[in-house]
């Protein structure tokens, strides 16, 4: 109707490439019924609790250790694997936000956490390399999130909320978040709108976000149910979004 052509073959090829990437990612994280991995050997009764909303270190007990091939009782220097503890300050990759990095220390060794992932059954996996000594199941461990990594990730996470508010102010209340990605170096924010933004609109949004950043508004953490969150005036939730009870 408007002399627009669609490269259907190219679209289908790109879609299939993305499907392959998604399947491979699920295999790495054992997410949503992925292929069997070493994590399937773990006792399903074992769980992890995240306690890192207001601190970056904690003491915990090591409940599971794995190499890349099997569940083990100990890791030695040079081993690559996963550490699971009962309580952790490490945030796992989810909701478009990359998981924390840092170190796990025991009296006998040190493990460098290269990424943190969410596993089936409420487990949080700290994936990385044993860089010094050894550690065993049952050891008391000191969990230490990288302060710089967490701080930069938090800044970009907060920026997505500032950006959403600025977009709704400039473009209208029809704007809804459709996805996002956050890590220490960048953010991506997907949203609904009827057309491409003009240079003037982009400049207005940028000015609003920068003004709010300059105000240094205090950031607080509240843990609440979805129903409670829907009653808070500053919260804009997507009507179609599926979330847990907390």
Q: For the regions a protein language model found, what residue spans apply to each?
A:
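A glycine- and charged-residue-rich anion-binding loop/surface
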Residues: 1-238
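Single conserved hydrophobic/aromatic residue that forms the stacking wall/gate
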Residues: 236, 243-246
């Amino acid at each position: 109707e408007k002399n627009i052509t669609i490269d259907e073959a190219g679209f289908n090829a790109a879609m299939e490439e993305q499907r392959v990437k998604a399947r491979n990612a699920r295999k790495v994280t054992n997410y949503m019924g992925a292929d069997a991995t070493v994590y399937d050997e773990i006792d399903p009764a074992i769980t992890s609790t995240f306690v890192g909303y207001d601190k970056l270190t904690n003491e915990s007990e090591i409940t599971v250790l794995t190499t890349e091939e099997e569940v083990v009782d100990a890791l030695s220097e040079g081993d690559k694997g996963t550490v699971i503890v009962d309580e952790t300050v490490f945030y796992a990759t989810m909701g478009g936000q990359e998981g924390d990095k840092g170190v796990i220390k025991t009296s006998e060794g040190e493990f460098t956490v290269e990424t943190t992932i969410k596993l089936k059954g409420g487990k949080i996996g700290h994936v990385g390399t044993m860089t010094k000594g050894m550690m065993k199941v049952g050891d008391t461990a000191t969990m230490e999130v990288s302060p710089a990594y967490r701080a930069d990730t938090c800044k970009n996470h907060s920026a997505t909320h500032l950006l959403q508010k600025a977009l709704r102010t400039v473009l209208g209340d029809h704007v809804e978040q459709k996805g996002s990605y956050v890590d220490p170096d960048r953010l991506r924010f997907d949203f609904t709108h009827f057309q491409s933004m003009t240079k003037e609109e982009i400049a207005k949004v940028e000015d609003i976000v920068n003004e709010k950043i300059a105000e240094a508004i205090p950031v607080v953490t509240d843990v609440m149910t979805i129903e409670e969150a829907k009653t808070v005036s500053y919260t804009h939730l997507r009507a179609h979004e599926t979330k847990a009870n907390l």
